[in-house]
Amino acid sequence: MDSWAGHEVPRLPGRGGPLMLFDSARQGVAASTPTGTGTMYVCGITPYDATHLGHAATMITFDLVQRVWRDAGLDVTYVQNVTDIDDPLLERAARDGEDWKVLAMRETALFREDMVALRIIPPAHYVGAVESIPDIAERVLTLVKEEAAYRIDDGTGDVYFDISAAPRFGYESNLGREQMLKIFPERGGDPDRAGKRDPLDPLLWRSARADEPSWPGGGLGPGRPGWHIECAVIALNLLGHRIDVQGGGNDLIFPHHECSAAHAELLTGQSPFAQHYVHAGMIGLAGEKMSKSRGNLVFVSRLRADRVDPMAVRLALMSGHYRSDRSWNDDLLVTAQKRLDRWRRAAAAPSGPSARTFLAAFRERLADDLDSPGALTLADSWADAALVGTGDDQAAPALFARAVDALLGVRL
C-alpha cells in the first residue's frame, strides 16, 4: 500500500538531546535510546470516518517523536498499518449499502490527503492488513503448533490465543483482571464466547462465513485475521523482534497493545516487545467524548473545506500535552490561528533575539516527553520579542521559522 507524499524537513544547527518518553508499561518517563535507527510502529486507522481530530492528534504525537529523533541525529524506520478488514468496517459498509472495499479505499485516500495537509512525515512502510494476511496466517499456525493458540470446538474453526501461555500478560496495561473483564467487551472483545478457555482470550483467526469476505489461510482454512495479531505480525516482519516505540491512542492500551505484545513475545521468545508503549490522549468536543456513536466527530477534511489553515489545526492540537484527554472547541482554533499569524509576522521581522538560545530551550522542551505546550510558549515569547523590535540578530527570524518547521511540523 502506498504511503503519502512527504515534505522536506529543514536541518538545524547542532543536535537535539535524547528523547524522554512516558512508557505506559513502566508508568513513568524514561529515555528513548535507539542505537542508530529508531523503530516505531503506530496503529493506524480502520478506514471509515477518517480523519477525525482524534486520529489527527495521535498522528501528530508520533510525528513529533520522529522529528525529535531525527533532530538528535537518528535515522527512523516508522511503520503504520491500515486495518482495512475488520468488523466495524464491514458493519459500516453494510449500513450504508456500500462495498466495503470501496469504502476502505476512499477513506484511506482521504486520510492520506489529510496527512499531507497536516505535514505528517510519512511512514517508511504503510501496510494494509489485507496484504499481510498470508504472513499473519503463517504466524497464527506457529502459535497453534506451540500450543499458545487453540480452535474453538463449535464447528466454526475460529482460533483463539491462550493468554495462559503469556506469563507476563497484563504488564503493558497494568490492569487487574476485573478491570480487563470490564474493558474487553467495550473494545471489541468477546468474553462470553462459548468454548473459550479464558474470557479474555483474543481472536486470532475468524474462519470463513458465508456472508463475509475471507482469504486462504493455509492450514487454518479460509478466513480473516483478528485485530491484535495483525499489528504484531506487521511490526515483527518490518521492524524485527524488538521495537523502540509502539504507539497509538490510549484506548489501545488494552486489549489491543496488551494482546499484540503477548502475541509478538510468544512468537519471538523476547520481552518486552517495545521499549516504550506510548499513548496519546482522547479528543473530546465541548466537554463530551468525541465518538462515532454520538455523531459529534470533527473531521480534518471538513475543516479544510471550510478553509481552515491545517497549520492552525496542528497548533491547536499541540496546545495540550499529548498524553492528556482534552476537549476541542472553536476557541482553541481561533487562538491557534492568532498564534500562527503572530509567528508568521515574527518570522518576517528584520531581526530578533538570538534564535540559537531559543532553539536550545525549544529542543529541551520537546525532548521532555514531547512538551508541546511548553514549546509553544517559548515560541510565543520569541515571536512577541521580535515583533516589538527586541534583539538585533538578523539571522534569527529565518532560524526561528526553520526550527518551528523542523520540530513542530508547522510551516510559517
Curated annotation (Swiss-Prot):
Any Gene Ontology biological process: cysteinyl-tRNA aminoacylation
Reaction catalysis annotation: 1D-myo-inositol 2-amino-2-deoxy-alpha-D-glucopyranoside + L-cysteine + ATP = 1D-myo-inositol 2-(L-cysteinylamino)-2-deoxy-alpha-D-glucopyranoside + AMP + diphosphate + H(+)
Cofactor binding notes: Binds 1 zinc ion per subunit.
Motif 'HIGH' region boundaries: 45-55
Highest rank taxon of the organism: Bacteria
Keywords carried by this UniProt record: ATP-binding, Ligase, Metal-binding, Nucleotide-binding, Zinc
CC cofactor: Zn(2+)
Pfam families linked to this entry: tRNA-synt_1e (PF01406)
Lipoprotein recorded as keyword: no
Residues involved in Zn(2+) binding: C43, C231, H256
Any single Gene Ontology cellular-component annotation: cytosol
Extent of motif 'KMSKS' region: 289-293
Binding annotation for L-cysteinyl-5'-AMP: C43, G44, I45, T46, T58, N81, V82, T83, W227, G249, N250, D251, I283
EC number: 6.3.1.13
Extent of motif 'ERGGDP' region: 186-191
Any one GO molecular function term: cysteine-tRNA ligase activity
Tagged with keyword Amino-acid biosynthesis: no
Signal sequence, start to end: none
Coiled coil: none
Family: Belongs to the class-I aminoacyl-tRNA synthetase family. MshC subfamily.
Quaternary data: Monomer.
Protein's job: Catalyzes the ATP-dependent condensation of GlcN-Ins and L-cysteine to form L-Cys-GlcN-Ins.
Name of the protein in its database record: L-cysteine:1D-myo-inositol 2-amino-2-deoxy-alpha-D-glucopyranoside ligase
Organism: Salinispora arenicola (strain CNS-205)
